[in-house]
Amino acid sequence: MKIKKITCFNFETKNQRYIKYIIIHYTGMNNQRLAIKKLQSKVAKVSAHYLISKRGTVYQMVEDKNIAWHAGKSQWGKDINLNNKSIGIEIVNTGKEAFPKDQIKQLLRLLKILSKKYKIKNKNILGHSDIAPNRKKDPGPLFPWEGIRNLI
């Protein structure tokens, strides 16, 4: 899988960490360039490990071993502050539109790679709305969860 590297400054450096979850987000923006700019902004103080464009280009912004700032105040079961235990994937989408086929295809490929590498169970592939239900809605009602879970 081809992954393009781009620079991001919003993360905490770690030598090693336990990755238990993958958190899926939408950018809330239709424009890939603006989404990347926001994720790179030192003022915004947000980031993700990966971003997938509408055409299916995969970008890595933060190395997996480091903590990206994507989950915010979050909880799943007894685990809190999920930035520490997760990989964040941003998908360029406003949240009000269907997700393009090429984008979902590349997301599936990335999920398979990460799940295998870190031994992440399907039940631990979550949406931002799962871990912060009172604050977040992404990846939203148009996200194809059923197809994703069946194909991983």
Residue ranges and their predicted role:
Residues 1-80:
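N-terminal catalytic cores of peptidoglycan-degrading enzymes
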Residues 80-88:
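Short coil-to-beta-strand
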Residues 85, 94-152:
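Basic/polar, cationic surfaces and motifs that engage anionic cell-wall
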Residues 90-92:
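Short loop/turn segments at strand-loop or loop-helix junctions that form parts
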